[in-house]
């Protein structure tokens, strides 16, 4: 294959790999919640749902670490990440609400529920990041100029000097 016809590698990291702190944070929070649920001998459904979510997150991490997402091109991986984040947030929010009702009787179960609730927040942040990346890539594909603001404080401090715009009096 000619080097000029070669497909350039994307320098952008995939949305679900370990370079994104949301994935590692969600995995550690769900592992902590699972440990709390196992120690308190919680309802089997709590343990099952959290262990299922751990398996799904580990599956996505393995896909990205082994770079299998480049081989399976018929799947739109960012959309699959978005769907996973939304479904994880829904399931873990149900577990968190049900587990946090046991505050007065079993405190460690309440801690597990609060860890699940924190994992829900992290999954929502991950879904927002994936959606933003998808929208940026779609705009770039369609040829729409993508405007990036580096800092919102940049507009707050106007330039000073002889070439700076003057305020109307």
From Swiss-Prot:
Superkingdom of origin organism: Eukaryota
Residue span(s) of domain MARVEL: 17-135
Gene Ontology CC, one term: membrane
Compartment(s) of residence: Membrane
UniProt keywords, alphabetically: Chemotaxis, Cytokine, Membrane, Transmembrane, Transmembrane helix
A Gene Ontology molecular function term of the record: cytokine activity
Record's bilayer topology term: Multi-pass membrane protein
Cited InterPro entries: Marvel (IPR008253), MARVEL-CKLF_proteins (IPR050578)
Tissue specificity field: Highly expressed in testis.
Main location class: membrane
One GO-annotated biological process of the protein: chemotaxis
Transmembrane segments: 22-42, 46-66, 79-99, 110-130
Family recorded in the similarity comment: Belongs to the chemokine-like factor family.
Protein name (record): CKLF-like MARVEL transmembrane domain-containing protein 1
Origin species: Homo sapiens (Human)
């Amino acid at each position: 294959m000619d080097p000029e016809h070669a497909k350039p590698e994307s320098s952008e990291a995939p949305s679900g790999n370990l370079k994104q702190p949301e994935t590692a944070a969600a995995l550690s929070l769900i592992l902590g919640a699972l440990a709390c649920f196992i120690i308190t001998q919680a309802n089997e459904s709590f343990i099952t749902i959290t262990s299922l979510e751990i398996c799904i997150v580990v599956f996505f991490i393995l896909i990205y670490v082994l770079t299998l997402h480049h081989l399976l091109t018929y799947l739109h991986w960012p959309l699959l990440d978005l769907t996973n984040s939304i479904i994880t947030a829904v399931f873990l929010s149900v577990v968190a609400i049900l587990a946090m009702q046991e505050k007065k009787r079993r405190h460690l179960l309440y801690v597990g529920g609060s860890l699940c609730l924190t994992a829900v927040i992290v999954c929502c942040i991950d879904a927002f990041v994936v959606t933003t990346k998808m929208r940026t890539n779609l705009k770039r594909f369609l040829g729409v100029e993508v405007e990036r603001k580096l800092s919102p404080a940049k507009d707050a401090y106007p330039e000073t000097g002889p070439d700076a715009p003057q305020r109307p009096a």
